[in-house]
Design a protein with these regions (language model features):
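A conserved acidic beta->alpha catalytic loop
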Residues: 39-47
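Short beta-strand-to-loop acidic/aromatic patch adjacent to the donor-nucleotide binding site
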Residues: 82-93
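Donor nucleotide-sugar binding loop of glycosyltransferases
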Residues: 16-19, 42, 95
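Hydrophobic helical membrane-anchoring modules
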Residues: 1-3, 149, 173-246
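Acceptor/aglycone-binding surface of glycosyltransferases and processive sugar-polymer synthases
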Residues: 58-79, 96-179, 206-215, 219-225
């Protein structure tokens, strides 16, 4: 708990058995009140390990996708009374020690969302991010900043923290069940006028860390572009995008 606000960590998981215990071991329980793991129909023992670790476990009977997993995570976090929700991937790619600082930024009040940016501090490439992913990240981010009217260092990190107010207000059910969910929720937050902060975040790419392949990365990139152009066209009154309706 930070400043009397309940902090919940959500772990959207799929076949995370090899890295889950190491990730959970480093979560700062001095500030975290609740940990929820949503298992998206894993074929390994992710749920069993999570239960042994004492996490609140929700298991999908069928795979709902990365975005679908997050929707379940956020719904359960709000139902369990979270004031601040931090999403941490259970693949040990992001450092759990940043949960405290990210939650504190929200508890202090200036922001309603905080992103753990791999670009701030120049830690992306040194942490093992493939060069083509780094270049794509930078190119997409520049275009998104132009179309969304924002000034973020990146939109593609999986390390995020949100206030209850933001999550309860955004129509998350309109967002994709796939990876572009991450981008759409940020576009919605910007559209609704929420303040988004950033914190420098080192990252670690290694064989056990989850990552989408090149083909799915292309699909994701196209989805990012569609979202950004739809946002700009909606704001200009050229179209009425369902995603950005009141």
């Amino acid at each position: 708990m930070i400043e009397n606000k309940k902090v919940c960590v959500i772990l959207p998981a799929y076949n995370a058995a090899r890295t889950l215990e190491r990730t959970v071991a480093e979560i700062p329980m001095a500030v975290v009140d609740d940990i929820i793991l949503v298992d998206d129909a894993s074929s390994d023992c992710t749920s069993a390990i999570a239960a042994r670790l004492g996490l609140h476990v929700v298991r999908h009977a069928a795979n709902l996708g990365y975005g679908g997993n997050q929707k379940t995570c956020y719904r359960h976090a709000l139902e369990r009374g979270a004031d601040i929700v931090v999403m941490l991937h259970p693949d040990y790619q992001y450092p759990p020690r940043l949960i405290g600082p990210m939650a504190a930024m929200l508890a202090a009040g200036p922001c309603q969302a905080v992103l753990g940016s791999r670009i701030l501090g120049n830690g992306a490439v040194s942490g093992g991010m493939p060069l083509y992913k780094y270049i794509a990240n930078r190119a997409l981010t520049k275009l998104e900043n132009l179309l969304l009217g924002a000034r973020l260092s990146e939109y593609h990190t999986g390390y995020r923290a949100w206030t209850r107010e933001l999550l309860a207000a955004l129509p998350l059910e309109r967002c994709s069940d796939d990876f572009v969910f991450d981008n759409q929720i940020l576009a919605l937050a910007i559209h609704r006028g929420y303040a988004i902060g950033e914190i420098a975040c080192p990252t670690h790419y290694f064989p056990e860390a989850s990552s989408i392949n090149f083909a799915r990365g292309v699909v994701y990139g196209l989805g990012v572009l569609r979202t950004a152009f739809a946002y700009r066209a909606h704001r200009m009154g050229l179209i009425r995008s369902r995603l950005f309706q009141p």
